[in-house]
Amino acid sequence: MDPLDDFDRRTVMHDDRTFAVYVAGDGPAVLVLPEMPGITPDVARFARWVRDAGLSAWIPSLFGVDGADPSMERTIESMGSPCVRREFEAFATGAGSPMVSWLRHLAGVAHAECGGPGIGVIGMCFTGNFALAMAIDPTVLAPVMSQPSLPLDDPAGTFIADDDLVAIRARLDRDDVEVRAYRFEGDTYCQAARFDALSSALGDRFRPTVLPDDAAGEVGWVGVPHSVVTTSLVDEHGELTAAVRDEIIEFFATSLGIPAI
């Protein structure tokens, strides 16, 4: 359990929807969207690395128990929430997810408070696709997708409507923004077909990186190398996952106009 006591806990409301947000650091903002089952200690660890790089880390509490260790039971409980199911179903149909609307509002709040040219965002696992959906917003200058895992029943699916992908591509071209994406080669939740589909839709604006499975540390209850910057990251010099972590944080820093540490 991580008490998260080095973060400032706030509440943010938009369209009658209120979520807690944990904020740490100074400098331009980076939204760290948690993976299932929520803000785990490893998600918080990544946010602290963002903070220590001279950026402001903002973690919205979208589901689960804040600070709790991950487990299959907690993930099933989070996925089974009616509110969470409605969010993902709306996103999948292209009808426009209230969650994306709220996250775009949060991006505006964070940008107004922290300044800089814009914000960064990283989505992980179930929230990986949300980072791409947010890239329609000109505030988002550094979008990162880490093992985007939806839809689970279609390895080539992007979980974003075709018209929305066209609009996102146009915005990326207009503002010269690229999308970084990461997965492990043998990840059964985020397979090669999804990255192929995203490459087809986004062209050279999509910058994928595929890590070999033997670069992963722990795999956790999922049973395969999966969580690139959290559970499976090995925080040691010379480790590929640590290098990827550094690459992502440098991408945030340079895109948001601060010197990379």
Language-model-derived ranges and their functions:
Residues 1-261:
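N-terminal cap/leader regions of alpha/beta-hydrolase-fold enzymes
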